[in-house]
Amino acid sequence: MAFDKLGRFFGISEDDEMNEVPYTESEEQQEEIPQTQKNERRANVVSINSGVSATSKIVLYEPRVYSDAKEVAQNLLNNKAVIINFARMDDEQARRIVDFITGTVYALNGEIQRVGDKIFLATPPKFETDGKIAELVEKKDKMD
């Protein structure tokens, strides 16, 4: 009798054991929710930018004064490669512009290469250049 009161206090009694419903596996199978529809919808998502092909531009410059370096740097900032011909400038001014452009290219993680006697190629970060023209120029200079 004392055990019955104690059992009821904790929720354990002989009456409760009689009221339990046996578990069947058929109930579990009915509760499953199909998830294949969600996965099929996600497979149809396509990035908008994946079909668009970007065009790359190369800008040619023949600077005559130091202030022209700003335009060259602006094109590099706009992800355009720049070929600079210093044939019509004195060497001191050309060195100043090359120093300025080299700083710009360094800040952008780009590259600058000498491709001729007074010709440089400056490229922004995502441009690839292949080959070396400098070797051909050196061979030509040795032949002359």
UniProtKB/Swiss-Prot annotation:
Residues 14-41 are annotated as: Disordered. It holds the Pfam family SepF. InterPro entries: Cell_div_SepF, Cell_div_SepF/SepF-rel, SepF-like_sf. GO terms for biological process: division septum assembly; FtsZ-dependent cytokinesis. Gene3D superfamilies: SepF-like protein. Keywords: Cell cycle, Cell division, Cytoplasm, Septation. GO terms for cellular component: cytoplasm. Residues 14-31 have a biased composition (Acidic residues). It is found in: Cytoplasm. Belongs to the SepF family. Homodimer. Interacts with FtsZ. HAMAP family: SepF. Cell division protein that is part of the divisome complex and is recruited early to the Z-ring. Probably stimulates Z-ring formation, perhaps through the cross-linking of FtsZ protofilaments. Its function overlaps with FtsA. This is Cell division protein SepF. It comes from Lactobacillus johnsonii (strain CNCM I-12250 / La1 / NCC 533). The gene is sepF.
